[in-house]
Amino acid sequence: GNEIFSDKIGLLIARNLSKTHKNSKFIVDVKSTGLYSNDKILKNNQCQTIYWKTGHSHIKRKVHSEKALAGFEKSGHFFFNKPLGYGYDDGINSAIQVCRLLNSDDRKISEIMNELPKTFQSPTMAPFCKDNEKYEVVNQLVKEIEDIKKNKTIIDQQEITEIITVNGVRFSFDDGSWGLIRASSNKPSLVVVTESPTSDERKKKIFEFIDELLPVS
């Protein structure tokens, strides 16, 4: 069988929940797939997705402060607020939600997954950066990417259309492709992720753009 990563399991759960909980909010971390932003089922059910800081405690607090229905972290930490749960990291509830998803649909999960647009996502990469330098390095990269957006610089034939700076910098393009650079919270490195719904080559081009920005150690 094929491996399904946690961010896409979260999206399947969110889509299913949105049918009975319209106008809900969902919190996801900045490493998660960009499919949440443009998902037709979530949009049709007037649901909002907020990208937030990576980390168990950050997602938990944001779910509480936003009164979100649920929060999904790519690492697999899932949180469900009332009336589904009590807002803490809940593996049993997560399994229940997957079972409910399957119970409401006669298809196999592989067939349900095939409804999602195909994306090409890099593994989470961790270029070395000293602990006492990594946050300043990221701050500088945020400024550089903000300038690139402001100046409408073309990257692989597209401009950056959106920037999220709640946790490093996540920048997106019109075609739904995006890249992320943030400081690791628990080791001397940066965190780099790229994703494209267009092609594997596009994903690689965004990584090459990031690689050129990174300072040489």
Give short role names for the model-derived ranges.
Residues 1-11, 37-39:
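Short Gly/Thr/Asp-enriched flexible loops that form oxyanion-binding sites at enzyme active sites
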Residues 12-20:
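A conserved helix-loop-strand patch within extracytoplasmic ligand-binding domains
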Residues 20-193, 199-217:
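Phosphate-binding and adjacent anionic-ligand microenvironments
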